[in-house]
Each structure stands twice: as C-alpha cells, then as structure tokens.
C-alpha cells in the first residue's frame, strides 16, 4: 500500500475498481448535511499522516471492489446522500469516476478531501469538503493552495482546531484568501483526542 502515500499515483483502468476500507450507513455528523441519513464510502490509503487523524485504520488494507459493486452496495440504503471519504479518496484516481457515476444516478454526493491533492477534475456536482490543514496537523506544508481556485458556493472548507495557534492561523487564511466568499460554509472543527505525546494542546482561551 506504499503507493497510496504518493501524491502521483498513475491513472488506472476503471475496471480495476477501488480499494475500500468500509461502506456503512449512518447519520452525517458534520458538514452541510449534518443529521441526515448518509451512506459513507471510505476509500483506503492516504498520503498524509495528520497528528489528530481518527481513521488511521484506513491507511492500509481494504478490499478491492468494482465500481459497480460499490454503487450497488451504496444503493441498498434508501437515502440520496452519499459521502466519499478516506483516508484521502483522491489518492485513488478511479475515485473521480465513482463520483461522476454516483451523480449521474441522482445521488447528492459529498467528497471529504485533505486538499493535498488536485481537486480540479472533481465532478462539479459533488460538494467538496476541503480540510485545509492547520499547523498542529504537522501537514500544513502539504496544503495545495491552487485548490482554492476550484472551490464554489457548492463547496465547504473545514479547519481542525486543536489550540489557539490553529485558530489564529485559520482566521488568517480566511482573510488572506477571502474563503467565506468562495464557499457555502466554513467550519471550525475542534479536536481534543490527539495521541498523547504527539502534540501539545493548550487551552483555546
């Protein structure tokens, strides 16, 4: 699975499908569809190693499934909402094809992405939820700022806030890039359960 840590994975044949960690049905816990029944499709692999990541189990393993099987499984639940997440879904090029096919079938699709990989080719009907990495993630140097040019009012931006420094940094990005004018919603998402000894978490105020 080392290739899924690379940001330059070659495009593969759609027939190869995708490596999937899990597909499950639950209530959306964040973003604009908060509280709505949603099918989550979690893709395997991620090029980042954020200090506060709560889905490290998705870094490796998974099961390779055809696009048809993934769509059929997701369609068994009677909800129009599908969230494609990871890991980093865009680490697998066939994710782009999956997103398009889901939209063609009439689903309301959101994509949770780290923002470290190019989003310019993501299907426009998809609501991108771009997680701009804050300093405490230890991955803020991986933010691909050109992605901000491809955000619309259909999209959202998320900042994971672990401490006051993250909060101030996030406010500065809002001002620098006028992010509130680019997207429908900007989320400040607090994180508390960071692995002990990895980072210090001083009080927010």
Feature locations, PLM:
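Charged/polar, solvent-exposed surface patches and flexible loops
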Residues: 22, 72, 76, 149-150, ...
